[in-house]
């Protein structure tokens, strides 16, 4: 198993404190890995700085070829990546193989093509006797912090656009789920020039803070919690670094009385509980119009209770464990707080399961009120609440009454209503009669405290560039 760091093109052991990496399905230690030391962090950043002078001037074609080679290598090692991700995260193995690995490969291939298609305003004489042109140049050294819910996927979302744009990257995966990023480092070592991509390991307080605060780091990209985002923004503010933040969500799922309730129930069963609900776009905050509320509660209860929990390697498993014991405790506390409210009905689930591993039963909580914490706060687990509403104006207010602004969905057969709501919902994405659908060509990113900046799409590529104006007098 690959456990070494990648610094300046060389795989090396960490020199810092050793940290245990767990299998959440069993609670057992997989292995221990030594963190990067401050000297190693500095060496990784300095390697990126030194290489940037050359890598930043390479042609888009050359960078694209490297990304395509990495995509091919991931595809060729798909089963090994999937097994590592499943073991380290508790994800059902078949979900990683069939859903995540193909999407990861596609992200690298998309940005390989996008690198060769950056656009800008037409050059011209906007001032007589002077010709102006626009350049999109790489920023420099990017520090990327990836989360624990989709370790390899989020690494791909960060690495592909940054490298395609000509930046050099130092990435730190979560200390909870580092195995696939470290495996990726071993493949990248033989594809990219030394220093272009560096992979570290360690906790936020010991490695992340040193990395993001390094004076030579020009940009910080984070996918994580609001608290982590706020910490990094405060930490990097004195240096005025470029930042790119995706900080979670609490997606409203608005169901009108003309919606296809079977489709809604099946959709929430899939989109609310994929990856054990550990997804910032999860369909977790349901609003149902009064006329269909009881019927939808019944259908959702039947759908959610039919989800099969089990071992990640079992092909029939739909729901795996949560990622860590600490997170299991957070989810349990959130549900217990909701259950203590007299108006909340537990339709199914509501507690962790017996036995080994960090499993929490798929949970549906009915009759939640707008002000309830279960409606307002991100639980990030297999927990869905449902709230009754009366009319379009009310549900629009409630849908937008959130500090989050990442994703939302509207379920209705009324095209006009769908357009009205999608235009007014304060979310980076609104799906109509579906949820959770992501493609490399379209942007993913939020508003409000869900952060700013886009992943995927040409907009994501542009986020890792500097717009510059060149004027020539003649």
Swiss-Prot record:
The keyword Ligase does not apply. GO terms for biological process: L-lysine catabolic process; putrescine catabolic process. It is an enzyme of class 1 (oxidoreductase). Gene3D superfamilies: Aldehyde Dehydrogenase, Chain A, domain 1, Aldehyde Dehydrogenase, Chain A, domain 2. The active site is at 246, 280 (nucleophile). PANTHER family: ALDEHYDE DEHYDROGENASE-RELATED. This is Gamma-aminobutyraldehyde dehydrogenase. The lineage of its organism: Bacteria, Pseudomonadati, Pseudomonadota, Gammaproteobacteria, Enterobacterales. The gene is patD.
């Amino acid at each position: 198993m690959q456990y070494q760091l990648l610094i300046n093109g060389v795989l090396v052991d960490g020199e810092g404190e050793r940290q245990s990496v767990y299998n959440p399905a069993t609670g057992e230690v997989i292995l221990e890995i030594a963190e990067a030391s401050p000297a190693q962090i500095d060496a990784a950043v300095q390697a990126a700085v030194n290489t940037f002078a050359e890598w930043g001037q390479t042609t888009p074609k050359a960078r694209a070829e490297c990304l395509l080679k990495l995509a091919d290598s991931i595809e060729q090692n798909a089963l090994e990546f999937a097994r590592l991700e499943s073991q380290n995260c508790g994800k059902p193995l078949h979900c990683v193989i069939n859903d995540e690995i193909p999407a990861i490969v596609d992200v690298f291939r998309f940005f390989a093509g996008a690198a060769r298609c950056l656009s800008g305003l037409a050059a011209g004489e906007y001032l007589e006797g002077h010709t102006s042109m626009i350049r999109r140049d790489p920023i420099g050294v990017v520090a990327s912090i990836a989360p624990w819910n989709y370790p390899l996927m989020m690494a791909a979302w960060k690495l592909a656009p940054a490298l395609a744009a000509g930046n050099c990257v130092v990435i730190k995966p979560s200390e909870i789920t580092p195995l696939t990023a470290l495996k990726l480092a071993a493949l990248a070592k033989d594809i990219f020039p030394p220093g272009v991509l560096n992979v570290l390991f360690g906790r936020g307080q010991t490695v992340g803070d040193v990395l993001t605060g390094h004076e030579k780091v020009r940009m910080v990209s984070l996918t994580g919690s609001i608290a982590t985002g706020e910490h990094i923004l405060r930490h990097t503010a004195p240096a005025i670094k470029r930042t790119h933040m995706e900080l979670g969500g609490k997606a409203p799922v608005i169901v009108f009385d003309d919606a296809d309730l079977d489709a809604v129930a099946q959709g929430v069963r899939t989109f609310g509980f994929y990856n054990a609900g550990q997804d910032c776009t999860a369909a977790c905050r349901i609003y149902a119009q009064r006329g269909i509320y009881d019927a939808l509660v019944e259908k959702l209860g039947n759908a959610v209770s039919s989800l099969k929990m089990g071992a990640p390697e079992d092909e029939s498993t739909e729901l795996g464990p949560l990622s860590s014991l600490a997170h299991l405790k957070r989810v349990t506390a959130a549900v217990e707080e909701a259950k203590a409210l007299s108006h909340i009905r537990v339709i199914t689930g509501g507690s962790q399961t017996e036995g080994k591993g960090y499993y929490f039963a798929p949970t549906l909580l009915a009759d939640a009120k707008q002000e309830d914490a279960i409606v307002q706060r991100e639980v990030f687990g297999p927990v869905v609440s449902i709230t009754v509403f009366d009319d379009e104006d009310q549900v629009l207010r409630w849908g937008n009454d959130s500090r989050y602004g990442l994703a939302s969905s509207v379920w209705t057969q009324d095209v006009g209503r769908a357009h009205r709501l999608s235009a007014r919902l304060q979310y980076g994405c609104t799906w109509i009669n579906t949820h959770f659908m992501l493609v490399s060509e379209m942007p993913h990113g939020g508003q409000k405290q869900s952060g700013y900046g886009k992943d995927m799409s040409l907009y994501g590529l542009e986020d890792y560039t500097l717009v510059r104006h060149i004027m020539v007098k003649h």
